[in-house]
């Protein structure tokens, strides 16, 4: 099977030095042989909002692609659970449309088996007073690419993301989060944490972009990375862009290993270093 084609994903909105290899990611893909699994559309309204929406998807053998569209009506409080898995190469593109004062609690579990690849693209557009609270967990042993783009279009709209991952073996984990602030008094909070062991590789790109007109808006992002192997590779790219004066943007990262005091605590209780790292 020809996999010489490359898809460019997880792009930074503004490019940085090419030699850092963080401007985007490329994934091998055979467009001609990709199975189109169609589009599923959902409408969450006042009548059905009490029942959480469950979306469980497994990719087909080889290359496959799926589209999801979710419309959340004005004033509705929606909950969506998504579980994505594959033994091949699977691309899932999900678009959320939130109307005035709608809220969405989104829980995503992204998984891929050995030698498999999952690309999950999640877009959200928030009207005035609308908001998304996303929890995303990246697990499994295959390569995982998570691409998240949120438009805070309306005043007082908001977005929060809690992202967790565990990289192991020779796995690649590549996460991109872009939040575009358009409306006034908009807020976002991005909190990412995870651990890398063996020879795992991880890239996290977090972009908060304050557009003209987004005055009195606030954006915060942070990442915590635990390094559990000499061969792991970690790249963290926090980015704050600003075209508006009266805004607040903060970013930070904590990257380190288990300290000697913690290891001594475990070893004094008969727990080896390897067991402590797994804990």
Language-model-detected regions and their locations in the chain:
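Long, low-complexity, mixed-charge
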Residues: 1-50
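Conserved beta-strand/loop scaffold segments within soluble protein domains that form the structured core
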Residues: 30-271
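Catalytic-core signal marking the mid-to-C-terminal active-site face
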Residues: 277-279
């Amino acid at each position: 099977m020809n996999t010489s084609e490359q898809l460019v994903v997880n792009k930074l909105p503004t490019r940085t030095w090419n030699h850092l290899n963080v401007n985007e990611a490329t994934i091998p893909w055979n467009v001609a042989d990709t199975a189109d699994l169609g589009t599923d559309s959902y409408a969450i309204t006042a009548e059905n909002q009490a029942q959480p929406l469950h979306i469980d998807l497994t990719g087909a053998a080889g290359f496959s692609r799926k589209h999801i569209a979710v419309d959340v009506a004005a004033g509705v409080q929606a909950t969506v659970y998504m579980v994505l898995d594959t033994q091949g190469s699977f691309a899932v593109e999900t678009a959320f449309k939130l109307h005035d004062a709608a809220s969405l609690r989104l829980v995503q579990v992204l998984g891929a088996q050995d030698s498999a690849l999952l690309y999950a693209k999640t877009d959200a557009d928030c009207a005035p007073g609308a908001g998304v609270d996303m929890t995303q967990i990246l697990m499994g042993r295959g390569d995982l690419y998570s691409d998240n783009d949120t438009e805070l279009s309306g005043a007082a709209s908001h977005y929060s993301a809690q992202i967790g991952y565990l990289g192991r073996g020779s796995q690649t984990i590549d996460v991109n989060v872009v939040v575009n602030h358009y409306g006034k008094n908009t807020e976002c909070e991005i909190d990412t944490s995870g651990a890398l062991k063996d020879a795992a590789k991880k890239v996290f790109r977090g972009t908060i972009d304050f557009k003209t007109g987004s005055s009195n808006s606030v954006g915060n992002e942070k990442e915590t990375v635990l390094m559990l192997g000499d061969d792991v590779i970690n790249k963290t790219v926090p980015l704050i862009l600003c075209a508006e004066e009266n805004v607040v943007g903060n970013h930070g990262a904590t990257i380190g290993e288990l300290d000697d005091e913690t290891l001594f605590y475990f070893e004094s209780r008969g727990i080896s270093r390897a067991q402590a790292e797994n804990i």
